[in-house]
Structures are given as structure tokens and as C-alpha cells.
């Protein structure tokens, strides 16, 4: 709170990521069923139980995408930055469709060039993801004895190719990968943040209040003739550039 106050920002409400995830993937089905959302973050994985779209229980696991990167770094003897790039740009979440003949050359921690096989690295990723999702499944069972109608997996790691295969192997047909569509964002990394924006907007609507992402002065500047050719190096451009730059 003190940090925001020092920046001249007034805090009017507090929300949690579990609510944001629910609003990021809100559907009519969720309003009548019991389900869970698993958000695989960098260092932790959240498991949240919902009843009719409302958060009822929440748990955190000390496992995340970093564990996958650590596995890659250890096995191939590469630094953490290289491991992250291999995970995000080359590996698959499941070995299905990974090529045994596809290689990429990278430098290891000894300065030597090594070849990394796509099928082999995908097996490593799949093994760790299976562990994370299996533990999450056990956590769901500890949170409720009721039948689960859906499991949505989100978080940056869920953007990996073939993630749907490993999710369905662990949870069956009730599993699906999150697909953030709000305000044009196409990255599950931002599901909690974007969902919380949607949640806040819905609260304002219920109160009959108007809302905007920019001030009146910014709107005037954006539509003024003298600034009509201004580049996106502005506050608004930076905000949207943050989401769409990747």
C-alpha cells in the first residue's frame, strides 16, 4: 500500500489471482458446475476450486516452470537463460509430435557447442509437467470429495505446444487449456492480471459507474490534431505494448 501511495496511486480495492483466473475464463458452464483452475507460474502452481464460478478453496504448490528449466539446465549443462529459451522456443510439453531428427545447437556452461534433440528435451519437459499436474490432481482431491466437471490449466507454461496432450493424460476429457481472449491478449501468462481487470469492470458496472483506462487529458491528446501522428511511445502505447510485444 505504501508503495502505491508513494507513486500517487490510490488503492480502491484488493483482489486475488484466483478471482482473476475465474474471470479470464468465465463461461455459462462455470456458473452451474464445480471445477478447478490450475495456474502454473514460474516458481509456484496455484490450485483453486470453484463452485458455480465462486472461489471456495485455494492451495499453492512449490513447483512451477522454473523446475522445468532447472531440469533442462542440469541435464544439458546449460545456463538458466538458455534453458528457458529451449523450453519456450524448442521443446514440446509432450513428446507426441516432437521430432527425433530435429536438433538445435547451443553453448553449454563450458563454452562448448552441443546439440539438443527435440524429442529428448520434450521427454524431460513432459516428465516434470506430469509430476506437477499429478500433484495438482491430488491437491484437488484433498480440497473436495465432489466430482469435478472441468479443469482449466493456465499460466505461461501452458502456452507450450502439445500441452493439451499431457493435461488430458492426467485429467482426462474434463481438462482444457485456458485461452485468454480478453482485450486482445493471447497469452495465458497474463490470465490472472487480465481477469482481475474484467472483475473490477464488472464491479463498477454493478455499481452503475463508468470506467476508462486513460484520463480525460490523455484522451484529448490522443484525438487532438497536433498529436494524431504521435508514435506509440506514450503511456497507452507502453501499456498495450507490454502485452502485445511478444
Sequence positions of predicted segments:
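Gly/Thr-rich phosphate-binding beta-strand-loop-beta motif of the actin/hexokinase/Hsp70
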Residues: 28-57, 72
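Nucleotide/phosphate-binding catalytic cleft detector across ATP-hydrolyzing
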Residues: 1-35, 79, 85, 93-111, ...
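Glycine-rich phosphate-binding loop plus the immediately following alpha-helix
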Residues: 1-7, 13-14, 54-88
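Phosphate/pyrophosphate-binding loops at sites that engage ATP/ADP/AMP, CoA/4′-phosphopantetheine
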Residues: 133, 137-149
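Short, solvent-exposed amphipathic alpha-helical segments in soluble enzyme
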Residues: 30, 167-172
Amino acid at each position: 500500500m505504501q508503495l502505491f501511495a508513494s507513486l500517487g496511486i490510490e488503492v480502491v480495492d484488493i483482489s486475488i489471482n484466483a478471482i482473476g483466473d475465474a474471470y479470464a475464463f468465465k463461461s455459462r458452464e462455470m456458473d452451474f458446475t464445480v471445477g478447478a483452475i490450475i495456474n502454473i507460474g514460474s516458481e509456484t502452481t496455484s490450485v483453486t476450486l470453484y463452485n458455480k464460478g465462486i472461489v471456495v478453496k485455494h492451495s499453492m504448490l512449490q513447483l512451477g516452470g522454473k523446475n522445468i528449466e532447472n531440469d533442462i539446465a542440469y541435464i544439458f549443462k546449460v545456463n538458466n537463460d538458455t534453458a528457458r529459451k529451449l523450453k519456450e522456443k524448442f521443446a514440446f510439453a509432450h513428446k507426441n509430435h516432437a521430432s527425433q531428427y530435429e536438433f538445435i545447437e547451443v553453448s553449454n556452461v563450458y563454452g562448448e557447442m552441443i546439440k539438443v534433440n527435440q524429442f529428448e528435451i520434450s521427454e524431460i519437459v513432459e516428465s516434470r509437467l506430469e509430476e506437477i499436474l499429478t500433484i495438482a490432481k491430488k491437491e484437488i482431491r484433498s480440497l473436495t470429495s465432489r466430482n469435478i466437471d472441468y479443469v482449466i490449466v493456465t499460466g505461461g507454461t501452458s502456452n507450450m505446444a502439445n500441452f493439451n496432450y499431457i493435461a488430458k493424460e492426467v485429467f482426462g476429457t474434463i481438462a482444457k487449456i485456458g485461452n485468454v481472449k480478453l482485450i486482445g491478449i493471447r497469452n495465458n501468462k497474463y490470465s490472472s492480471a487480465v481477469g482481475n481487470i474484467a472483475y473490477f469492470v464488472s464491479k463498477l458496472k454493478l455499481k452503475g459507474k463508468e470506467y476508462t483506462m486513460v484520463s480525460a487529458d490523455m484522451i484529448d491528446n490522443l484525438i487532438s490534431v497536433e498529436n494524431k501522428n504521435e508514435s506509440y511511445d506514450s503511456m497507452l502505447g507502453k501499456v498495450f505494448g507490454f502485452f502485445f510485444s511478444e
